[in-house]
């Protein structure tokens, strides 16, 4: 019996066994915890046992199923590996909602190992050659065989199917997995960036709807989609001309392990790029062109920058230098090198130095969505994610697309001057500091949050810091350490007159107003003096419309530990 016929028969046998159970009160009983860690209902166990009996009649195989985990079926050498979800959409079946399915995927075992784990470890989802999904309630069947296209079967009538050609999200119908829904998904729904959303409750069938063009895409951006949920649908969508990746655009190719989980975006090529851009690491699908900025007053940093250039040359990867780095390196360069002229053409910015170099890079990026690869040449370097020994592995991870990007909040604002004019402030990655022009001279402020007066402050100055900057000047002034991805800001008086004037953490959506009641001050943004403010001026700060993006490296809490040891 060939693999397709076997898969079709397994699905039919499951349908015959499950249909009579609909409405039976014992179908809903939890009989055990399945191999995947979720409760197994009686209906699931019966369906799985029927599938095992169906397989035993025709072949020896390795079965991978949510309920049983791994099982070797038959006494002979296994010929096939079968990935099974006996009832996908168990809740729907128990409530007689006609949207639940049996999903079967089969691959051939060419090499046999006596050790079952060794055998399975050598197999991936790409090795599956046949996928069958049968709607148990209606009998509608979707199937595909590698290299032979995808098909839909209803009441004996067979049709070829293919994905939609929709290219505009606003015109698209999206299938969505809503369990443990993410903030990004909620925002996607709230912003109505699509025509319609559908939540059906059977991932296998929803993937088949994408394969036949009834849905334009299916997404689950949480890392919760299991092998057995998607194995059959994966084969069918691929044969229908679709793309199946994780949320970052990396092709899904799970180990054949019942506990394997992944995020999923299924669609056509045109929509896929847009969905990855919304939910994942959009930079993985952008051509790589590094920008390089280095500390130029440190010979070791210049040497590392030179080695980075040589490494990129050896890989054939494009790069451009900022002008000061170019001038520091021009006598060492062995080939023509471009100076950054259009920041939008840069995909990733490599910063070599300390936190000051990162701040220079952030200012240069000017709000564009360009991830920074930050190499620490100093001590702790809270803004730097990699040490100098990790630079080449960091570059390699970006080239091959296996990296994560962390989004961080910035500050934006303006000064409302006493003469009625406005002065727009540059965005701040770390902090805005309002400080006295003359050392040891006390200043007088009023601090407002969302229009309400919070405190009257006498101090040497005041810091408004992002979480990113909470480990810098703010920390030295007695402010709290805030994890970089937290959505908030901290207001820290510098050497306050009153002991009751303490740091204040506020929501990132708050508007912060600082009114100067006495003396002229300097407004300093990320270490650079922005302008001189006078008595009566108001500094208005809020969350920036743009964010900073960092390629993830060292764990934030590891850096805290290093700080405690200094």
UniProtKB/Swiss-Prot annotation:
Predominant place of localization: cytoplasm
Catalyses which reaction(s): NAD(+) + ATP = ADP + NADP(+) + H(+); NADP(+) + H2O = phosphate + NAD(+)
Residues where Mg(2+) 1 binds: 66, 85, 87
Region (NAD kinase): 275-566
Entries under CDD domains matching the protein: Arch_FBPase_1 (cd01515)
EC number: 2.7.1.23, 3.1.3.-
Gene Ontology process terms (BP): lysine metabolic process; NAD metabolic process; NADP biosynthetic process
Alphabetically ordered keywords of this record: ATP-binding, Cytoplasm, Hydrolase, Kinase, Magnesium, Metal-binding, Multifunctional enzyme, NAD, NADP, Nucleotide-binding, Transferase
InterPro entries according to UniProt: ATP-NAD_kinase_N (IPR017438), ATP-NAD_kinase_PpnK-typ_C (IPR017437), Bifunctional_PpnK_predicted (IPR021175), Inositol_monophosphatase-like (IPR000760), NAD/diacylglycerol_kinase_sf (IPR016064), NADK (IPR002504)
List of residues binding NAD(+): 355-356, 360, 430-431, 441, 458, 460, 471-476, 528
NCBIfam families: PRK12676.1, PRK14076.1
Function in brief: Involved in the regulation of the intracellular balance between NAD(H) and NADP(H), and is a key enzyme in the biosynthesis of NADP. Catalyzes the phosphorylation and dephosphorylation of NAD and NADP, respectively. Although it shows conflicting dual activities and is able to supply NADP, it seems that its physiological role is to prevent excess accumulation of NADP.
Name of this protein: Bifunctional NADP phosphatase/NAD kinase
Organism annotation: Methanococcus maripaludis (strain DSM 14266 / JCM 13030 / NBRC 101832 / S2 / LL)
